[in-house]
Curated annotation (Swiss-Prot):
Role noted for this protein: Catalyzes the pyruvoyl-dependent decarboxylation of aspartate to produce beta-alanine.
Description of how the protein assembles with itself and partners: Heterooctamer of four alpha and four beta subunits.
Protein source organism: Bordetella pertussis (strain Tohama I / ATCC BAA-589 / NCTC 13251)
Molecular functions (GO terms): aspartate 1-decarboxylase activity
Family note: Belongs to the PanD family.
Residues annotated as catalytic: 25 (schiff-base intermediate with substrate), 58 (proton donor)
EC code(s) of this entry: 4.1.1.11
Subcellular location as annotated: Cytoplasm
Name of the protein this chain belongs to: Aspartate 1-decarboxylase
Cellular component, GO, one term: cytosol
NCBIfam families, per database record: panD
Length: 122
């Protein structure tokens, strides 16, 4: 049996841009992608801490070191610049893999720079 498990999480990043007329997706600073082990075009689930919205889209790379978190297309209706988000990826794992799995959690500062990387639970 396979279980769908939390693989990685960007915790409380701040939306820096919302562009309704761009072709879908979520732009994420490459430094954050590397820290979380996330990849371009990977499906993500987003949880808006500010307004309670929950939605999904896919990743595109934003400039390294920019702190960018941009919501594009329809996703731009789900959050505003300044909103706090939790961005998660999930993946299938066997019973054995899931028993030992510890998701990667990336904590950021107010400028969306990596502050700490944790394996959860600590």
């Amino acid at each position: 049996m396979q279980r769908i498990m939390l693989r990685a999480k960007l915790h409380r990043v701040t939306v820096t841009e919302a562009d309704l007329h761009y072709e879908g997706s979520c732009g994420i600073d490459e430094d954050l992608l590397d820290a979380a082990g996330m990849r371009e075009f990977e499906r993500i689930e987003l949880y808006n801490v500010t307004n309670g919205e929950r939605f999904d889209t896919y990743i595109i790379k934003a400039a390294r070191g920019s702190g960018a978190i941009s919501l594009n297309g329809a996703a731009a209706r789900r959050a505003q610049v300044g909103d706090l988000l939790i961005i998660c990826t999930y993946g299938p794992m066997s019973e054995e893999q899931s028993a030992a799995h510890k998701p990667q959690v990336v904590l950021v500062d107010d400028a969306n720079r990596v502050k700490e990387i944790r394996k959860f639970p600590a």
